[in-house]
């Protein structure tokens, strides 16, 4: 039995019901699935599993604005309203949440990793609704556990921050997940392939830039780079990064976008990547056929305005799943 795991029992769609897939919405079509069901066998074809990570403990430790614990419900509510474009050959299962208010951050990350591993065992592509960006380490661990030690797994992070901070004194938090991945790779004598899109210089200290400069395998584009380059050149940079890689894990921190587009985040951003450009880049990553799982993190509903940020996060999910389904 999975620890800290709670299957979904409540629908987030409250509109009319229509059996016609041409007019259906996500909330009508998504089906509940219990990962602890002993009768489950691997699925055939391309299908997705949506799981919430109800934790912002890492944000609290990192002195950010707490509230991301409420994000999975907020994103589900927005996603449920979107039109269903996936036909009847692709399914998105809502498998519930990882939740444990009295559990440590490390325990919850471990529980998420086991749930991700189980999804992969059932041939379901994971979609994780954070939670703080501590979500990423648990998601990454689960994906790695589903692979053999020699298998590659590149990481693309759309984020204003590197999240490569050392964690010896404070312990893991929302700003250390990719340093933990890096350290794991060093311990296993693997190269950590990591590409950050949307870095803001005023959000990262010189120690982090120095660490990146000295670390083989880590690349980044600033938000200003992306603005000047345009999406086609950004996509070519991603292609070069993914050359020779068979798998990529994608994580989207909603603080990559300006406060005008994403006001409800753990750490607001005055500058930021254009969401329209981001959609084109995300679709390109999905079209590579290498994307094995993705998450959206750091939505903070208590700080949101008219659900703008939750809706944007749901929009990214909509387009990523659509392209992944087409390239199955």
From Swiss-Prot:
GO terms for biological process: L-histidine catabolic process to glutamate and formamide; L-histidine catabolic process to glutamate and formate; putrescine biosynthetic process from arginine, via agmatine. It catalyses: N-formimidoyl-L-glutamate + H2O = formamide + L-glutamate. One of its GO terms (molecular function) is formimidoylglutamase activity. InterPro entries: HutG, Ureohydrolase, Ureohydrolase_dom_sf. It is an enzyme of class 3 (hydrolase). Mn(2+) 2 binds at residues 159, 161, 253, 255. It comes from the Bacteria. Its cofactor is Mn(2+). Gene3D superfamilies: Ureohydrolase domain. SUPFAM superfamilies: Arginase/deacetylase (SSF52768). Keywords: Histidine metabolism, Hydrolase, Manganese, Metal-binding. Transmembrane segments: none annotated. Pathway: Amino-acid degradation; L-histidine degradation into L-glutamate; L-glutamate from N-formimidoyl-L-glutamate (hydrolase route): step 1/1. Belongs to the arginase family. PANTHER family: ARGINASE/AGMATINASE (PTHR11358), FORMIMIDOYLGLUTAMASE (PTHR11358:SF35). Catalyzes the conversion of N-formimidoyl-L-glutamate to L-glutamate and formamide. This is Formimidoylglutamase.
């Amino acid at each position: 039995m999975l620890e800290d795991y709670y299957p979904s029992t409540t629908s987030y769609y409250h509109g009319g019901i229509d059996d016609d897939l041409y007019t259906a919405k996500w909330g009508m079509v998504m089906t509940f699935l219990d990962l602890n069901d002993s009768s489950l066998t691997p699925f055939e074809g391309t299908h997705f599993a949506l799981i919430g990570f109800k934790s912002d403990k890492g944000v609290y430790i990192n002195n950010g604005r707490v509230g991301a614990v409420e994000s999975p419900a907020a994103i589900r509510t927005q996603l449920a309203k979107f039109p269903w474009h996936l036909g009847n050959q692709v399914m998105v299962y809502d498998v519930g949440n990882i939740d444990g208010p009295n559990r440590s951050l490390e325990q919850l990350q471990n529980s998420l990793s086991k749930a991700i591993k189980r999804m992969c065992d059932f041939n379901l592509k994971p979609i994780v609704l954070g939670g703080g960006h501590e979500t990423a380490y648990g998601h990454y661990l689960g994906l790695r556990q589903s692979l053999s030690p020699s298998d590659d797994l590149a990481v693309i992070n759309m984020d204003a921050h590197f999240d490569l901070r050392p964690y010896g004194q404070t312990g893991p938090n929302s700003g250390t997940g990719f340093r933990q991945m890096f350290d794991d790779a060093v311990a296993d004598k693997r190269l950590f392939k990591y590409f950050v899109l949307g870095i803001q210089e005023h959000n990262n200290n010189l120690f982090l830039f120095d660490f990146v400069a000295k670390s083989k395998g880590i690349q980044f584009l600033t938000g200003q780079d992306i603005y000047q380059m345009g999406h086609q050149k950004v996509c070519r940079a991603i292609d070069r990064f993914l050359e020779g890689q068979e798998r990529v894990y994608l994580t989207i921190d909603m603080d990559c976008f300006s406060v005008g587009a994403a006001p409800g985040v753990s750490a607001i951003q005055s500058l930021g990547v254009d969401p329209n450009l981001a959609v084109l880049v995300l679709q390109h990553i999905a079209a590579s056929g290498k994307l094995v799982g993705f998450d959206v993190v750091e939505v903070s509903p208590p700080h949101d305005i008219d659900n703008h940020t939750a809706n944007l996060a749901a929009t990214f999910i909509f387009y990523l799943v659509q392209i992944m389904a087409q390239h199955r």
